[in-house]
A protein has these predicted regions:
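Alpha-helical scaffold segments that mediate packing/assembly in large oligomeric complexes
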Residues: 40, 47-54, 58-161, 292-301
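Sequence/fold signature of self-assembling virion shell proteins
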Residues: 48, 82, 130, 134-143, ...
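Short, flexible coil/linker elements and helix-boundary hinge sites characteristic
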Residues: 32, 121-124, 130, 171, ...
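Short, basic/hydrophobic alpha-helical segments
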Residues: 161-172
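Solvent-exposed loop and beta-edge segments used for protein-protein assembly and interaction
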Residues: 53-55, 172, 265
């Protein structure tokens, strides 16, 4: 629910973004002028643009009229509508953040070029940062081989360090939020120092350490693994992003609409809930995906 509430709603179903690429800023610097000399042109810069077209996403269901009549405890039709609406909202939110997870050839797949998932987006838009847990353990222990830092503490420190270092490249707007699994949040909250004292007494202290506006847990993050172009497997740990930078576009008629019909041949009440929209991150380098390299562990296939 928070994802759909936080994204930017656009009244245009086709999302177009165009931005200047000035990463070669040194070549664009202003120059001092010496009397009598020729003034030189500064370097050129390129424009980054992409267009995202809409796709229809729907939930279709049916119920026998006999069941509607027999169930008297509650309004079963309204109850099923509530479930359909919840499923549609969850599917849209999952497609926006992670992708819908279906295989490319699946007939029901939400195309990743129609609703672009933040996690799987191009490196220009999403910074994919590795969390080096083994390296953090070595760094914390140092030359004191007798020191025994708890796994939770090492894990928490590795996540925080990777996130803060990656944030040096962050170009998003406002204060971002951190999305992760409930387990990762618990691991970081349970981190203890060598004396057994909790590092973070509550979520607010952890939120301050991560320098984010809110920590939002989502079970859908559990077990998500992607394969990179060089065939490495990366397990998603968390995602830092300000959903206001993501545009969800839909024109009049494309908003979430509910249709009902009664089939007299089969004596069934039928329901269709659908929307036609597009979605895309509109700011470059505005998302940070924290990942763990699981290439050699066999995770994810």
């Amino acid at each position: 629910g928070k994802v759909l509430a936080k994204v930017h709603k656009s009244p245009i179903s086709r999302i177009r973004t165009r931005q200047a690429d000035i990463r070669n800023i040194e070549a664009l610097r202003a120059q001092g002028y010496k009397k009598g000399s020729e003034k030189k042109y500064v370097g050129n810069f390129s424009l980054i643009h992409r267009t995202t077209d809409p796709q229809t996403v729907y939930v279709k269901s049916k119920i026998d009229r006999d069941d509607i009549i027999d169930i008297q405890d509650f309004d079963v039709v309204q109850y099923l509508y509530g479930i359909d609406r919840m499923n549609l909202n969850e599917e849209l939110a999952t497609a926006i953040v992670l992708g819908d997870g279906r295989e490319d050839g699946d007939e029901g797949k939400i195309a990743q070029d129609k609703i672009r998932p933040i996690w799987l987006d191009d490196e220009l838009y999403t910074i994919h940062a590795d969390v080096d847990i083994a390296g953090m353990k070595t760094s914390l222990q140092g030359t004191n081989t007798g020191a025994n830092f708890g796994d939770n503490y090492v894990y928490a420190e590795a996540v925080i360090q990777s996130l803060l270092y990656a944030r040096e490249k962050y170009k998003g707007s406002g204060t971002p939020d951190f999305y992760c699994t409930p387990h990762l949040l618990n691991v970081m909250l349970l981190a203890r120092d060598l004396n057994g004292r909790r590092i973070y007494d509550n979520v607010n202290e952890l939120r301050a350490a991560l320098n984010v506006g809110e920590i939002i847990t989502a079970e859908q993050f559990e077990g998500k693994v992607r394969t990179t172009k060089d065939q490495k497997k990366k397990k998603l740990l968390g995602l830092m992003y300000n959903m206001a930078d993501y545009s969800l576009g839909s024109t009049k008629g494309g908003e979430i609409t509910h249709f009902t019909d009664f089939d007299i041949d089969f004596n069934q009440q039928k329901s269709l809930l659908e929307t036609r929209c597009s979605g895309a991150n509109t700011r470059v380098m505005s998302a940070i995906a924290l990942e763990e390299d699981v290439t050699d562990t066999g995770v994810g296939g």
